[in-house]
Amino acid sequence: MVKFAVVVFPGTNCDFETVEAIKRAGGKAERVWYKDSIKDYDGVVIPGGFSYADYLRAGAIAARQRIMEEIRELAEEGRPILGICNGFQILTEAGLLPGALRPNKIPRFLCKWVHLKVVDVRTPFTYLYEEGEVVRMPIAHAEGNYYIDDPSKVRIVFQYSDEKGSITEEANPNGSVLNIAGVANMEGNILGMMPHPERASHYFLGSEDGLKVFKGMVEWVRS
């Protein structure tokens, strides 16, 4: 069975539900403390939370821990790396994804459900979706305003949209450039996203739209 590491930093708080989402997707997952090794895992998820209490900047301290070098090595081998919310912030701070996550346009914490348009289905995390499919997931962040000088340096995977898939200013909750909610590296094996797919992975949570993210990466490794 394919096995994923769910990395836990001081302040991580979405690790248990991320493990459960991977299990529901048919994979095996283990919580791995950030001081331990992840070299024997098939892929890595950096879940949400407030690593190191967002001191300095969200993700800034976690991105400078030794485990990030192992994550970089796994990424270079082509293994899937997923960063969710704080995990996305950590990936940008570590230079594994271009761009930066800035404070929301309206400087406050946002916790709400949003609609997303699936733009790129050529990644391990999104190939089970249809291009242009509209999905529903929650966000919970204060620094989710994604900025990048040159959007051609990344693959835009998810965009904030209305329920019909229109990319509008009104549908953009945090001011992200081009309504970007998630991006991948050019190779497609590293994905960072601010919405929480693990919180949309079971019908009793209100949506199962996020489960395909985990099913995709599990089946991609298995194949």
UniProtKB/Swiss-Prot annotation:
Pathway: Purine metabolism; IMP biosynthesis via de novo pathway; 5-amino-1-(5-phospho-D-ribosyl)imidazole from N(2)-formyl-N(1)-(5-phospho-D-ribosyl)glycinamide: step 1/2
Cross-referenced InterPro entries: Class_I_gatase-like, PRibForGlyAmidine_synth_PurQ
Keyword terms: ATP-binding, Cytoplasm, Glutamine amidotransferase, Hydrolase, Ligase, Nucleotide-binding, Purine biosynthesis
Coiled-coil positions: none
SUPFAM superfamilies, per database record: Class I glutamine amidotransferase-like
Name of a matching Pfam family: GATase_5
Gene Ontology cellular-component terms listed: cytoplasm
SMART domains assigned: GATase_5
Function summary: Part of the phosphoribosylformylglycinamidine synthase complex involved in the purines biosynthetic pathway. Catalyzes the ATP-dependent conversion of formylglycinamide ribonucleotide (FGAR) and glutamine to yield formylglycinamidine ribonucleotide (FGAM) and glutamate. The FGAM synthase complex is composed of three subunits. PurQ produces an ammonia molecule by converting glutamine to glutamate. PurL transfers the ammonia molecule to FGAR to form FGAM in an ATP-dependent manner.
Subunit (UniProt): Part of the FGAM synthase complex composed of 1 PurL, 1 PurQ and 2 PurS subunits.
Protein name according to UniProt: Phosphoribosylformylglycinamidine synthase subunit PurQ
Organism: Pyrococcus furiosus (strain ATCC 43587 / DSM 3638 / JCM 8422 / Vc1)
